[in-house]
Amino acid sequence: TAVVVPFVMIVLFTIGVIVAAQKRNYEEMVQDVSLKQLGSLTNNVTLELRNFLEAPFQINQILSHGISYHQLYPSADLSAVENYLRSSFTRIYQPLQQIDVISFGSEGAEYVGIRKEPNQKYALMVKDARTAQVLTIYQSDRISDDVRSSIADYNPKLRPWYTPIVANPEPAWSPIYANVDEKQEVTLSALAPVMDGSQLLGVMVTDVKINTFNAFLRRLHRNTTALVYLTDNQQRLIASSSKSSIVSWGTEQTQAGERLLATESINPVIAAGSEYARQHQLTQNKSTQHFSFAQDGDRYFSLLTPYHDPHGLQWYIGVIIAETDLLGTLPQKQEKSWLLGIGVSVIGILLGLVAFNRIMAPITTTANTARRIAQGDWDSQLPKPGQIYET
């Protein structure tokens, strides 16, 4: 016992140190690999998002300058602005899939807009003297008897894309809001004032169709298996690689028609990652946060990165990837190698104990016999003779 117990303890301690060192090295490796992979995906999303948003913003400023420079808004009749927007949209900016509507709202509460339709056609929306100050949406891009819908008492000056420019007449982004047309889609608008000297004439608006960015995120998910989502500074979803809608049907925290909180996402992994970020207040640091969490027995790594642009957007880009997707079968192989190592060590201990017993048996027998003889037991049986080999 005096020899065997220390031997076993030393072997077990050595095994524990080796396993702990391997586990630590694995954790350092997986953290490093996940950070690099998630960082690369985040950079890709950031670049695509910047290009996605910058083009509509620049176009909106060009259109605003054109209306002001050519003095297209002299009266309550917006036909000149209508023709300018129609020709610009259909001839120049039609390839930009993210642009949904370009429109103009005036200080006189008139409104004109051209909306892109799914069939590659356009719909005209007008509220001016020609429509008796009723917002009228036509089936085509011209005023006709073919009316799709009408909205009475529509005042563009009360819309969330108009009031920010009144408060600060500088190009900016609107809050994310729902349109009041028959589609009521979630929209982000690029805003620019139309000025006559220092006088505000109206607001030029270019609506960005956010669900077109969802298409990019879903392609990214198919190619990498990573989940990607965008949230605003209130952690409400803006876009997601998940196919589920970001609009609520009514929950405890979100009214029907509003955007869901990220923690309410239909996708359980996005919801779990967002809940972890909320509980640990990761968005309060205003810096990139790398973390891992568990969901349904699987481990996931996530990178939460702030996104800012010069025009007022304060969003977050969340990227999530599963450990199995990140490293393939390496975790399973690592676990098998640990089990194999432990098994080999146990066999080694057992073989060592057998060897020790074979070596120590004659010694302990001789010692016990000598002790009994010393105590006067002359009938003690002597151990069997053996041979000693010099090595």
Model region roles, listed by residue range:
Residues 146, 153, 157-158, 197, ...:
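Intrinsic low-complexity, intrinsically disordered coil/linker regions enriched in small/polar
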Residues 358-386:
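Membrane-proximal alpha-helical signal-transduction linkers
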Residues 3-4, 10-98, 171, 186-187:
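Juxtamembrane extracytoplasmic/periplasmic/luminal helical "stalk" adjacent to the first N-terminal
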Residues 6, 16-24, 336, 340-361, ...:
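Cytosolic-side ends of inner-membrane transmembrane helices, especially those
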Residues 28, 213-219, 321-341:
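Membrane-interface helix-start motif
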Residues 127-213:
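Extracytoplasmic/periplasmic ligand-binding sensor regions of membrane-associated signaling proteins
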Residues 58-61, 92-110, 117-141, 167-173, ...:
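Short N-terminal helix-loop-first-beta-strand/juxtamembrane motif that initiates sensory/input modules
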Residues 202-209, 301-330:
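Short, hydrophobic beta-strand elements of compact beta-sandwich sensory domains
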